[in-house]
A protein has these predicted regions:
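Acidic, polar ligand-binding/catalytic clefts
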Residues: 70, 83-147, 214, 218-219
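Short loop->beta-strand "edge-of-pocket" segments that line small-molecule binding or catalytic clefts
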Residues: 45-48, 66, 145-158
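Periplasmic-binding protein-like
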Residues: 50, 128-135, 198, 202-244, ...
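Ligand-binding clefts/hinges and TM-proximal coupling segments of bilobed small-molecule sensing domains
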Residues: 31-34, 160-176, 212-219, 242-266
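Extracytoplasmic small-molecule ligand-binding "clamshell" domains
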Residues: 38-109
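Extended ligand-binding regions for polar small-molecule ligands
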Residues: 70-79, 139, 157-159, 226-264
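Short, low-complexity disordered leader/linker segments with a strong preference
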Residues: 1-43, 265-266
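Short helices/loops that flank or line small-molecule/ion binding pockets
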Residues: 78-79, 87-88, 92-105, 119-121, ...
Length: 266
């Protein structure tokens, strides 16, 4: 009888330890401390708008998403011990999806602005960009944004490029869901210019767009990209900032940067 009692005590101790390990394993990556207990597995639900090469784009003939942002968020997920699941959605749908809890993270070349910081939590900056004007290659009349007054301008909805276009006097601004559509409208003659982020337009030109288009003027309004989370998810924001700092310290960030942009900016 004594042996049976001792065996049962050892069994109960082992069972409690196993249950504690299971409880730790099922804590989710994206939630707060309370929300984490309800997560079935360690998954970081990420969303992006995949027409913003070289930051995020869909590989030709594949459903796989590639780009600087995609490599970066996967590296952050690895630091956090999370499985990263990435969904596609329109750029203007990203912040609403965060606020409704449908996703944990949005990364899509998203500029850190005061307006966005009112709506969501923004990480420390991970890339510095700026805006540039693109016109057709044979257009010699438009030399800078100062020449766009009264012209037809294309931009991507919900972006700082759209804000800049709307600030041009008497301009007729057409907003598109994707950067690809904006560039196509320029090629087809539907607009006189496109305003978008400099690295995105630069990548488009490098991939063959230079045969039909060119940039004019200087890079405008240096802006920094950040990773967005739900406003009250401070724990996840802290974890992302910590992971980002570690990636910069251990050289992994520089490795990813060099893959997509060549020489590393110091």
């Amino acid at each position: 009888m004594l042996l049976e009692v001792m065996f049962m005590k050892k069994y109960l101790v082992f069972l409690m330890a196993a249950l504690m390990l299971v409880a730790l394993a099922v804590a989710g990556c994206g939630g707060s401390k309370d929300e984490a207990k309800a997560q079935p597995e360690k998954v970081l639900r990420v969303a992006t708008e995949p027409t913003f090469a070289p930051f995020e784009f869909q590989k030709e003939g594949s459903e796989e998403l590639a780009g600087f942002d995609m490599d970066l968020i996967r590296a952050i997920g690895k630091k956090l011990g999370c499985k990263v699941e990435i969904a596609n959605m329109g750029f203007d749908a990203l912040i609403p999806a965060l606020n409704t809890g449908n996703i944990d993270v949005a990364i899509a070349g998203m500029s850190i602005t005061d307006e966005r910081k009112q709506a969501v939590g923004m990480s420390d900056p991970y890339y510095t960009s700026g805006l540039i004007v693109m016109v057709k290659k044979d257009n010699n009349d438009i030399k800078s944004i100062d020449d766009l007054a009264g012209k037809r301008i294309a931009a991507q909805i919900g972006t700082t490029g759209a804000d800049k276009a709307n600030s041009v006097k008497d301009a007729k601004v057409t907003l598109f869901n994707t950067n690809t559509e904006s560039a196509m409208e320029l090629t087809n003659g539907g607009v006189d210019a496109v305003i978008n982020d400099s690295p995105v337009i630069g990548y488009y030109l490098a991939q063959g767009g230079s045969e039909v288009a060119k940039t004019v003027g200087d890079v405008m309004e240096a802006e920094q990209y950040g990773i967005a989370v739900k406003k009250d998810n401070t724990k996840l924001l802290e974890d992302i900032n910590k992971a980002l700092a570690e990636l910069k310290k251990d050289g992994e960030y520089d490795k990813i940067y060099k893959t997509w942009f060549g020489e590393v900016k110091k």
